[in-house]
Amino acid sequence: MALLCFVLVSSEFMPVSLLTPIANDLSFTEGQAGQAIAFSGLFAVITSLFGNTLLARFDRRTAVIFYTFVMMISGVIVTSAHGYGMFMFGRALIGISIGGFWSLSTAILVRIVHPLSVPKAIAILQGGTALAFVVAPPLGSFLGNLIGWRGAFFTVVPAGVICLIWQMVVIPKLPPQRDTSIRQIASLLRSRIFALGMIAVTLAFMGQFSLSPYLRPFLECVTGLGINMISLFLLGVAGLTGTLISGFFVRDNLLPALTGLPAGLAIVAGLLTALGHIPAATGALLLVWGILVTPIPVVWNTWMTRIIPDELEAGGALMVALIQFAITMGAFTGGESFDHQGWVSTFMLATALLVASAIIAVLPGRRSLAEK
């Protein structure tokens, strides 16, 4: 399941580093190519809220296998696309797969592992998601240079086959426990603690993705680092390190992680603004950024299992929808700021969003210990 999370989220964000070859090959603008991320995000939001309601009568194992098939079909369609419409149709399918599977993943995990192993299992599962957030763009760049952009997207097909076989072997039959309706999802927000938690996680992802997509132009133009160095640095060090230590942040008391991670990212963003012209300092700060980014989905999913242990499908659906919304809005507002006010304003925007997330997370973080 962690591998599937990694493959899905990597597929969503690989276009970040492949905009130019995609646009040149399919004869449309880089702006249109960039819409692929927003388009898949839109369908992920829709599917996370409505998809599992439509599949409410199906065994959850069957639903996961279905979403894996959809991912593989998406890879084939995107790889063979010869125009804008076909390319975006493939991107819509990957959004459906992401929204559906990701919203179910934590609820499924809680049902198939021993209660004492839930925190560790979530760290492994969401570690795949978190690692993909960091390494997908440089991985796409590396694969694009090696086998072309079509080859890069086609890698999801053999990866999907591996996931499919493994799912059939290890995931037992999981009959649906209850229907997940929009009314049920919305009712979760009546809890002040849960609502504040959702606001905090939304701001955390908005802050992250108002800055992350624009690290490449920042590093190339301000710091003077080449793209190969960027790829190796992010892929080989920051993302992997952050994933490996994600379990460290999943403690009885989640407050330090829920507040400290976004606060740390805010400090890094601020320091990049001041020291971005110094390659050594920038490299060290990016390492810290990668380490602090990857545990965020792990910690928030663990928090959710403590706050709403009996409503994880509904909670997972809402969290995925909000994260996808945050990614889209963060990238959009960061891009607008980058284009019209310059990179400094983008980094300051990210800093403000991350600080707000840290402050709002205080109360939900305190309650998580009480619920434990």
Regions found by a protein language model. Give the residues of each.
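C-terminal transmembrane helical hairpin of 12-TM major facilitator-type secondary transporters
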Residues: 256-299
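Conserved MFS/SLC helix-loop-helix module at the cytosolic interface between two early adjacent transmembrane helices
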Residues: 46-82
